[in-house]
From Swiss-Prot:
Part of the 50S ribosomal subunit. Belongs to the universal ribosomal protein uL1 family. It comes from the Archaea. This is Large ribosomal subunit protein uL1. The gene is rpl1. Keywords: Repressor, Ribonucleoprotein, Ribosomal protein, RNA-binding, rRNA-binding, Translation regulation, tRNA-binding.
Length: 213
């Protein structure tokens, strides 16, 4: 169970934010301090597995062919991009950008990685969506399932950044535990732990925000 202060903050946000006619995202607004973000070592770039996921199915794109591609589709991949389609995307940047925006993340067989970097790096890189390599000893189905509960903490060179922690339809307890996992990870990876956290607020898409750190 999450610590009481985090749970109370989540409950307050959910109770005091007007209900919308769509499923709102619940996010964290993270503000860092006392860090020179021009130095790559101070930038946050961490994958976190949320104990309760995001309350929605992530759209995962997989660059693969043959049996791996078939198994990726069976495991729930939103898109399976073959080597032929990859070549087509290289010459159609509009289509490549559309695909990049529609997918939450990408996975690729290792033999695809050099071509992806060369032809799609300019599209995927700035979005933080360069593919996760599928290593030869890794099962594509298991990897897809594990990534359904994964998020990326990515500050780039900014002191302030946002990250989703779930949907408003989730229980306060589940959301609070997701928040606690993220705060704990930040405390672990930041140079001075919590002393590098100026504030952390939990908020809904269009509603109230409440401080948790």
């Amino acid at each position: 169970m999450a610590e009481k202060s985090i749970l109370e903050a989540v409950k307050k946000v959910l109770e005091e934010s007007p209900k919308r006619n769509f499923s709102e995202s619940v996010d964290l607004a993270i503000n860092l301090k006392n860090l020179d973000m021009n130095l790559p070592k101070n930038r946050v770039d961490e994958e976190v597995i949320l104990p309760h996921g995001l309350g929605k199915e992530l759209k995962i794109g997989v660059f693969a062919k043959g049996d791996v591609g078939l198994r990726a589709k069976a495991a729930g991949a939103a898109y399976v991009i073959s080597d032929v389609e990859l070549d087509e995307l290289a010459s159609d940047k509009t289509r490549a950008r559309t695909l990049a925006n529609e997918c939450d993340l990408f996975i690729a067989e290792t033999q695809f990685m050099p071509t992806i970097g060369k032809n799609l790096g300019i599209v995927l890189g700035p979005r933080g969506k360069m593919p996760i390599p599928l290593l030869p000893n890794k099962d594509i189905g298991e990897l897809i399932q594990s990534k359904q509960n994964a998020i990326r903490l990515r500050s780039k060179d900014k002191l302030t950044f946002h990250v989703p922690v779930g949907r408003r339809t989730m229980s306060p307890d589940d959301l609070a535990e997701n928040v606690e996992i993220i705060v704990s990870r930040l405390e672990r990876v930041l140079d001075k732990g919590r002393h590098n956290l100026r504030t952390v607020y939990v908020t809904t898409t269009m509603g109230k925000s409440e401080r948790v750190v």
